[in-house]
Amino acid sequence: MAGVNEIRSTFLDYFRKNGHEVVPSSPLVPRNDPTLMFTNAGMVQFKNVFTGLEHRSYNRATTSQKCVRAGGKHNDLDNVGYTARHHTFFEMLGNFSFGDYFKEDAISFAWNLITREFGLPKDKLLVTVYHTDDDAANFWKKIAGLSDDRIIRIPTSDNFWAMGDTGPCGPCSEIFYDHGDHIWGGPPGSPEEDGDRFIEIWNLVFMQFEQQTPELRIDLPRPSIDTGMGLERIAAVLQGVHDNYDIDLFKALIRASEEATGVKAEGDFRASHRVIADHLRASSFLIADGVLPSNEGRGYVLRRIMRRAMRHAQLLGAKEPLMWRLLPALIREMGQAYPELIRAESLISETLKLEETRFRKTLERGLGLLSDASENLAEGDRLDGETAFKLYDTYGFPLDLTQDALRQRGIAVDTEGFNVAMERQKAEARANWTGSGEAATETIWFGIKDKVGATEFLGYETESAEGVIASLVRDGVEVPSVREGETISVVVNQTPFYGESGGQQGDTGTISGEGFVIAVKDTQKKGEGVFVHIGEVTEGTAKAGDVVELKVDSARRTRIRSNHSATHLLHEALRETLGTHVAQKGSLVAPDRLRFDFSHPKPISAEELEAVENLANEIILQNAPVTTRLMAVDDAIAEGAMALFGEKYGDEVRVVSMGTAKHGSKAGKAYSVELCGGTHVRQTGDIGLVRIISEGGVAAGVRRLEALTGEAARLYLEEQDERVKAIASALKTTSADVLDHVNALIDERKKLERELADARKKLALGGGSSDGDSAVEAVNGVNFLGKIVTGVSPRDLKPLADEGKKQVGSGVVLFIGVGEDGKASAVAAVTEDMVGRFSAVDLVRAASAALGGAGGGGRPDMAQAGGPDGAKAADAIAAVKALIA
C-alpha cells in the first residue's frame, strides 16, 4: 500500500520523466496577488504565466502545492472533521503546460499515470467533459478506450473554468473513481451525484479561449493546460479507504492525538480528533509561511482555525495546551517534503502553545456563558443572533465556535441575526467616526497620477536634481499656486527625495525656484508611484509648472542609509543565530535609530544578542561593497534573496547584497541578500558600528530589536562609559572593579534581607508583642494560632503559616499581614488531621469579609485572601475563631 509521501513522489517523478520542471510549492500567502487571501490551487503561482504577463524558463511544470481553504468563498471550516473529504489544508498535485502540449497529451499523461503507475482498474474510472467539447471526448475514446456511457457530457459551469469575468478560460474534463455500489450515490450529472459513490480525483482544465467581454470569446494563440488532483483524495483511493481521514498521514496524526489525550477516536470524539489533525496541518504551515495569529486578515483566519482545534482539544479533556505536543508527529510525516516545518519548528511550537494558553480563559468563560444562554433550548431550536453576537463582540467568542459547540446538541445559530447585529455595529462605528483631513485627500493622488503620471525617482544616484512642479495641493485641494506661510504638498515630475516605504522614513530637504523656497518636512509615496513632498513655503510664491531645484538633507539621508543597511545585517545575523524561521515583521528606519520586528517565539538571551551584534559588526568591519542588481522577482528568490512577508513587488526588483559569510552553509557567499527598494551605504564600513540597545516582545511570536549605528552608537557607548565612571566614583573604586563591588553589595543586601525575614518570622511566631492573639490557644478544643504581622510581604505569609502548623501540631493557623498602605492579606492553614472538620478556604473567606474583601481561594489545607481594611485585622481573627467555636 503506497503512503502519502510515496504517492507524491511518484506523481512528481512521473511528470519529471515526461519533460516537466518540478517546481516547489509556493507559499500559502500569494505573492503580488491581493485578490487571494491564501493560495488555494496549484495554478495560483502560474497565474501571470497563463495571462502572458510573466515568462518562465520552462513551458512544462509539475507541483505539489500547499493550499488552504478557510476564508471567503472557499471556506470549508465548518464541515471539517464531520465529513470524509473536507479540509482546511490540503495538497494539490498538478501538471501544467504553458502553450506546449494540449488536450491529447494532457489526457494521455493522466490516463497512463492513474492506470499504469498507480494501477487503478479501468472499470472503476469514468470521466466528464464539457457538453460541446467533442475533441476531449474523442481523445478519451482513443487513448483510454472508454465507451460513450463512461464519458459523461456536462452542460453546466462545473465543467467550464474561467479565471474571472475576462481572461483565459476553457472546458474541463474530470476523472471520477467508483467506490462501488455498496455506497449510495450516482454518477456526475445524475440526480444522485451528491452521493459518495463516485468521487472526483483529477480535474483537467483546457485553457483554449480568452473571454474579452461577456459576449465575446476568442481562441487563445497558445492553448495551455492546468490540472489539479487532491493528494489526500487519491491517497484514499490507492489505500483502499473511502475516507480521507483513514489514510496513513491522518492515521498517524490522529494516533498522536489519541496518545496525548488518552481518548480514542471513537463515537462523539471521532470528529474532535479529525478537527485537531486537520487544523494542526493548516496552523503549522501558515505559521511556517509567516502568518501569525491576530485579529484581522489572514492572522484572524489562522486564529479561528487554531481556536476551533483548541475547542475540540477541550472536548477531549485536555487540561494543558495540546497542539504543540502533536507537532513532532506532523514533522515526522511531512517534514521531509516540506522542510519549512523543520526550519520553523520552534516558532510553530511556541505560537501554538502561547495561543492555546491565552485562549483557554476565553474558551472557559465563553462556554459558560453559552451554556447559560442556551439552557432552555432543545434539539432543533436556534440560538438567537443577538446572543451569538454578544458572545463574539463582548467576550471574544467566535461565531464558528458557538456553532460548533451547539452542533452536538442539535441546536443551530441564527446567523442572519448575527450578521444584522454585526452590520448595525459597523454602521454605528462609521456614523461615530468623523474621519480626518489627511484621509480625505488620499483619493486625490490617483487623479494626479492619471493626469501627470508617476514620479521618476532619481534618489539612488543623486541627492539633488532639477524638476518641474506637476501639482500643488493645499488642504486636500489641488491649487494653481501657494505662498509663504502655507503648509502644502508638492508633486514634481522627478525627484531625488525618497518617499516613505519599506519602513524607511521619507527624506527632508528643500525645493526652491525663482523667488521661493519650500522646506520639505516629509516625503510620502501615494497612489501608484506619486512622490508627495510635504512642507511649508518659507519664502515667496510657487506655481504649478515652475522649474525647481530639489536638494535632499544629505546628512540625514546618510544616517538613514546607515541604519537601513544595518537592518539587513541584523536580519541575517538573527537568522544565523536563532534559526531560519526568523522573518521580518516590520521595521522603522529613521535617522536617529532603527527598529526591527521579527518572528521568534521567546525572548532572546544576552548571549544570543551579543552573538547577533558581533556577526553584524563582523560584516561592517569587512568594509565590503554593497551591490544592487535589477532582476525578475522569481529569479531573485530562486537565487536566495529574502522577500519580505506581505510586501508587494513588481515584475522587476532591486536585489541588495552585502558582505561575505564566514560561517555555516553560506560561507564564502554573499552574507545578506534581500529584495529592497530603499537607500543603502556604498560600503559596509560606512555603517561604522551597530549597537543593539533593547529587545522585547510586541505581539505573540513577534520580537523587536532597537539599535543605533555610526555616530549615534558612538555617543551611546560614550554615555554608557560615563555612567560606569560615575558609579565607580560613588563606590570609590575603578571602572574595572565596578561589577565586583556591585555583586558584593547585592550579596550583602540578600544576607540582611534573610536576617530580617528570620527576625520577622520569629516575632510573628511568638516573640514580641502583637495587636491580636499571638500565642497558641484552645478554641472549642482546637489549637488555634492567630497573629497580626506588619512588615511581611503577602508572599511570605504562606511560609509563616507552614511554620505555624508545626507549632500548633494539630489545629488551625491564621496570619493577617497589614501593609503600609493599610490593606491586609490573610492566610489560613489547617493541619492534615483537621482538614475533615475545617476548610482553609472557608476560614480565609470569613477573614476576608471582616477585612472588607470578598472571596479568597486555595486548597482545603492552605488558602489566601485579602481585604482593603487592615484596621479590622483583629475582627478577622475573631471571625475565624467564631467559625471554629
UniProtKB/Swiss-Prot annotation:
The molecular function GO annotations come to: alanine-tRNA ligase activity; aminoacyl-tRNA deacylase activity; ATP binding; tRNA binding; zinc ion binding
Recorded hits in PROSITE patterns, A to Z, give:
AA_TRNA_LIGASE_II_ALA
E.C. number: 6.1.1.7
Query: Which co-factor is required?
Result: Zn(2+)
Catalyses: tRNA(Ala) + L-alanine + ATP = L-alanyl-tRNA(Ala) + AMP + diphosphate
- State which residue ranges cross the membrane: none
Instruction: Supply the InterPro entries for this chain.
Output: aa-tRNA-synth_II/BPL/LPL, Ala-tRNA-lgiase_IIc, Ala-tRNA-ligase_IIc_anticod-bd, Ala-tRNA-synth_IIc_core, Ala-tRNA-synth_IIc_N, Ala-tRNA_ligase, Ala_tRNA_ligase_euk/bac, DHHA1_dom
Q: Name one GO biological process term.
A: alanyl-tRNA aminoacylation
- Residues bound to Zn(2+): 564, 568, 676, 680
- Offer a single GO CC term for the protein: cytosol
Where mainly found?
A: cytoplasm
| Entry-linked SMART domains | tRNA_SAD
Alphabetically list the UniProt keywords: Aminoacyl-tRNA synthetase, ATP-binding, Cytoplasm, Ligase, Metal-binding, Nucleotide-binding, Protein biosynthesis, RNA-binding, tRNA-binding, Zinc
CDD domains attached to this UniProt entry: AlaRS_core
Q: What does the entry note on its domains?
A: Consists of three domains; the N-terminal catalytic domain, the editing domain and the C-terminal C-Ala domain. The editing domain removes incorrectly charged amino acids, while the C-Ala domain, along with tRNA(Ala), serves as a bridge to cooperatively bring together the editing and aminoacylation centers thus stimulating deacylation of misacylated tRNAs.
Q: Which function does this protein serve?
A: Catalyzes the attachment of alanine to tRNA(Ala) in a two-step reaction: alanine is first activated by ATP to form Ala-AMP and then transferred to the acceptor end of tRNA(Ala). Also edits incorrectly charged Ser-tRNA(Ala) and Gly-tRNA(Ala) via its editing domain.
Q: Tell me the NCBIfam families matching this sequence.
A: alaS
**Which family does the record assign?**
Belongs to the class-II aminoacyl-tRNA synthetase family.
Protein name per the record: Alanine--tRNA ligase
User: Which species expresses this protein natively?
Assistant: Brucella ovis (strain ATCC 25840 / 63/290 / NCTC 10512)
Gene for this protein? alaS
